[in-house]
From Swiss-Prot:
Its main location: cytoplasm. SUPFAM superfamilies: YhbC-like, C-terminal domain, YhbC-like, N-terminal domain. The lineage of its organism: Bacteria, Pseudomonadati, Pseudomonadota, Betaproteobacteria, Burkholderiales. It comes from Polynucleobacter asymbioticus (strain DSM 18221 / CIP 109841 / QLW-P1DMWA-1). The keyword Cytoplasm applies. Disulfide bonds: none annotated. The gene is rimP. This is Ribosome maturation factor RimP. InterPro entries: Ribosome_maturation_RimP (IPR003728), RimP_C (IPR028998), RimP_C_sf (IPR036847), RimP_N (IPR028989), RimP_N_sf (IPR035956). One of its GO terms (biological process) is ribosomal small subunit assembly. It is found in: Cytoplasm. Keywords: Cytoplasm, Ribosome biogenesis. Belongs to the RimP family. HAMAP family: RimP (MF_01077).
């Protein structure tokens, strides 16, 4: 948690927002960033700028790493915070629960956003419309504490835009 706060503060000073931090084998520290306005995409130059800053800041803060990787969230970006679940309302996601609900942990459906409670409160409930085993549309109601991981389902159009 301390690492996340320090890295988030460094990114904020550079004008970026932290999406997630992952630690992998071999000392890899993967930091995923985005622009706070969500309009401008992350470029290689953005990743280079952040990498340069963090390669100096992390040793000063005694945050261990052997290799540092900076990246954008990508097409299948993780959906982590309450604000993300609200922001991506209406989008298709793959959602995995920590504990099975109705004999299922994995769901693919459309986010319904905040259903009840305050956005950043622990009792906030979000919704997901998905196709049930019988083919009928069902709704899953969940809190962030129940979610193991969620990612956007990439939408790729190989035919190009239609006018």
């Amino acid at each position: 948690m301390r690492d996340q706060q320090i890295i988030a503060a460094e990114l904020e000073n550079l004008g970026y927002t932290l999406v997630e931090i992952e630690r992998e084998a071999g000392g890899l520290l993967r930091v995923t960033i985005e622009n706070p306005d969500y309009e401008r995409l992350i470029s290689v130059l953005d990743c280079e700028k952040v990498s340069h800053q963090l390669s100096y800041a992390l040793p000063v803060e005694n945050i261990p790493y052997e290799r540092l990787e900076i990246s954008s969230p990508g097409l299948d970006r993780p959906v982590k915070s309450a604000a993300d679940f609200e922001r991506f309302t209406g989008m298709e996601v793959d959602l995995k629960l920590r504990v099975a609900a109705g004999n299922r942990k994995n769901f693919r459906g459309v986010l319904q956003g905040l259903l009840s409670g305050e956005l950043n409160s622990p009792d906030a409930k979000f919704g997901l419309l998905f196709e049930g085993a019988d083919g009928a549309e069902s709704q899953l109601e969940f809190s962030l504490a129940e979610v193991d991981k969620t990612r956007l389902v990439p939408v790729i159009d190989f035919k190009g835009r239609k006018s």
